[in-house]
Amino acid sequence: MILLIDIGNSRTKYVQLISGELSATTQLNNSEFSAEYFTKYFNQASQLIVANVAKSALTDELATWCAREKISYKQVHSEQKKNTLISAYQEPTTLGIDRWLALLGTIHLYPQENVLIIDAGTATTVDLLTSNGQHQGGWILAGINALFTSILSHSTLVHAKSKTMPSLAFGANTSDNVNNACWAATLGMIERAIEQAQQLGDINRIILTGGDGKALTRLLLAQTTENILAVENIQFIDNLIFFGLQEYA
């Protein structure tokens, strides 16, 4: 059994890879990371494959434990090329590992398709992948929560509470004004990305992932999609990153 591990800024997710199939996802706070946890939950693994966007101390601790337990350990990094995927970055290692693995995961699921990938988490990223595996680059925007807190932190006169229900309606109070504008701005960026991508060639599929990806998928599907893409080709894929990590197994 191989463990695929995604270490985020505050939380870690992992899945088991058994005979080519991914298990359900387990999540934990990074504060729970310890040798005791590893021994309890990871000691049956033959290999750990890790992606990390957090402090290196977490992976250092995990690598040390693996060495002691004689378990194979591999931390993956963004590259210029992997399989058929070619990075658009002039300095490939500076592409976020989460974006790199989302691109790899997309090729794993949908080879030889032109795909627009939107990952909506701490940041909302857009990446265009063409059918020959060429990454065409993308955009990075502050995530929904970051947009919200940025407005409040730069104005002492705006008082609003974050709401979990996304809406594009014009608000009749400050909280709705701020919340709905954050969703509208993000959706507007996505729609502009779709238009720009289509100018470069036909798009076969739009994939959304990340913590806010499901809500954005619903908002996107609620808009007029006739000129965007067939509804069945606009989809949310939870934990797309693990399909990318699987390529390193």
From Swiss-Prot:
The active site is at residue 98. Substrate binds at residues 89, 96-99, 174. A monovalent cation. Ammonium or potassium. Belongs to the type III pantothenate kinase family. GO terms for biological process: coenzyme A biosynthetic process. ATP binds at residues 6-13, 122. Its EC number is 2.7.1.33. The keyword Transferase applies. InterPro entries: ATPase_NBD, Type_III_PanK. Pathway: Cofactor biosynthesis; coenzyme A biosynthesis; CoA from (R)-pantothenate: step 1/5. CDD domains: ASKHA_NBD_PanK-III (cd24015). GO terms for molecular function: ATP binding; metal ion binding; pantothenate kinase activity. Catalyzes the phosphorylation of pantothenate (Pan), the first step in CoA biosynthesis. Homodimer. It is found in: Cytoplasm. Its cofactor is NH4(+); K(+). This is Type III pantothenate kinase. SUPFAM superfamilies: Actin-like ATPase domain. The keyword Transport does not apply. K(+) binds at residue 119. It catalyses: (R)-pantothenate + ATP = (R)-4'-phosphopantothenate + ADP + H(+). Pfam families: Pan_kinase. Keywords: ATP-binding, Coenzyme A biosynthesis, Cytoplasm, Kinase, Metal-binding, Nucleotide-binding, Potassium, Transferase.
